[in-house]
A protein has these predicted regions:
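Short glycine/threonine-rich loop/turn motifs
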Residues: 178, 205-332, 336
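Residue-level recognition of short, solvent-exposed, well-ordered loop/turn junctions
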Residues: 31, 37, 122, 126-129, ...
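Glycine-rich phosphate/diphosphate-binding loop of Rossmann-like nucleotide-binding domains
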Residues: 157-212, 216-218
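Extended, charged alpha/beta regions that create polyanion-binding interfaces
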Residues: 58-166
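C-terminal terminal segments
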Residues: 32, 84, 99-118, 125-128, ...
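Solvent-exposed alpha-helices and their adjacent loops that cap or buttress functional pockets
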Residues: 7-11, 22, 28, 82-85, ...
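Short, low-complexity N-terminal leaders and the immediately following helix N-cap/first helix
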Residues: 1-87
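Flexible, glycine/charged-enriched surface loops at secondary-structure junctions
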Residues: 54-55, 80-85, 143-145, 203-207, ...
């Protein structure tokens, strides 16, 4: 790579994109590989470019675009594609819906290699097809190939980035509470749960309202399991009051309760359990009064096939406080980012 005055660069090949910013536009005015013409000189000067870099290949060096392609190659993600390099960077784009995962420890290692930079959406972020997930580039126009080789070594056999698509689930919904069962109070959980599950593939096998009767709750859950349910949602009866039977019913099913209570608000009293491979969520009343609770944070992980651990749920504390923005713009916010 050689630096030359623009007046002396006519007939030479540009080795980098040159960016223009004007009237809301930001993009490449000149692309790498462009052969500079007489008419380009004034345009380059207007962009503040008195000098440009002309490509001269040196052993052991790698150009920014080639480096970006090599960086993308170490982080191939099924269900995604990379753009062609532009202005020295490549973008990872989602081709499907799902939950984006990042090996943050490995990402920090790669970003500690000299000139390499990879920026991503947060780990556990729910994404839609067409979303931009990551950007990769080196800081200078060229770098030593040894830096790329080190990134390739670190990432070999590992998943730096991943997109886990949502899988269909058959869900049984069990609403508990004598006040609802007897008709004294109108149920408000069903429309909320249906609206939230509508964002994910699968079907709701049914919604059953149960009295505060342990056997009724357990038998209803067993009935859904017999129909092939692979996800159970319980609402109501999630507090620590002695007559709140939902946690007891879940235990009586034979499920392992991972936690009853999470360090996140709204939704502190959320219960997470597993009966074999069947996830079970106990959803507290905050889901009725708040547009977003920890229920919304956990659903993408369940539909993406993650098995939630106690450690996962403890980590919710950092980012677990909803700011109660009006209007709510979850998930493009701080809530549930861990």
């Amino acid at each position: 790579m050689k630096k030359v005055k623009v007046q002396d660069a006519v007939g030479l090949t540009l080795c980098h994109d040159i960016t223009a910013m004007r009237d809301g536009f930001k993009g490449a005015a000149f692309k790498r590989g462009h052969v500079i013409e007489e008419g380009d000189v004034e345009k380059l000067l207007d962009l503040g470019k008195r000098t440009v870099f002309i490509w001269e290949e040196n052993a052991g060096e790698i150009h920014e675009e080639d480096a970006a392609r090599r960086m993308a190659a170490v982080a191939q993600v099924e269900g995604c594609h990379y753009t062609e390099p532009s202005e020295g960077k490549v973008l990872l784009m989602a081709d499907t819906r799902g939950m984006f995962r990042v090996d943050t420890a490995l990402l920090n290692q790669v970003n500690s290699i000299g000139d390499l930079t990879i920026s991503t959406l947060p780990d556990h972020f729910p994404v839609e097809a067409g979303d931009r997930l990551a950007s990769m580039r080196i800081v200078p126009l060229v770098t030593q190939e040894t830096q790329i080789l080190e990134a390739e070594r670190l990432c070999q056999g590992k998943k730096l980035l991943d997109l886990r698509p949502y899988h269909p689930r058959k869900t049984g919904v069990i609403i508990t509470g004598s006040e609802i069962y007897t008709g004294r109070i109108k149920d408000k959980f069903e429309p909320v749960v249906r609206a939230k599950l509508a964002h994910y593939p699968g079907e709701i096998l049914g919604v059953t309202i149960c009295d505060d009767d342990l056997n009724m709750i357990v038998d209803t859950a067993k009935g859904y399991l017999a129909q092939g349910a692979d996800f159970l949602i319980f609402t109501g009866g999630m507090s620590v009051d002695p007559d709140d039977l939902t946690p007891t019913a879940i235990r009586q099913l034979g499920a392992e309760i991972i936690t009853h209570g999470v360090p996140a608000q709204p939704g502190n009293m959320t219960l997470v359990a597993y009966l074999g491979d069947v996830p079970i969520l106990g959803v507290p009343g905050a889901a009725i009064s708040m547009p977003t609770t920890i229920f919304d944070v956990l659903l993408p992980q369940i539909y993406a096939g993650d098995r939630l651990t106690h450690e996962d749920l403890i980590r919710l504390g950092d980012g677990g406080l909803c700011r109660l923005c009006k209007p709510c713009h979850f998930p493009t916010c701080t809530f549930g980012r861990y």
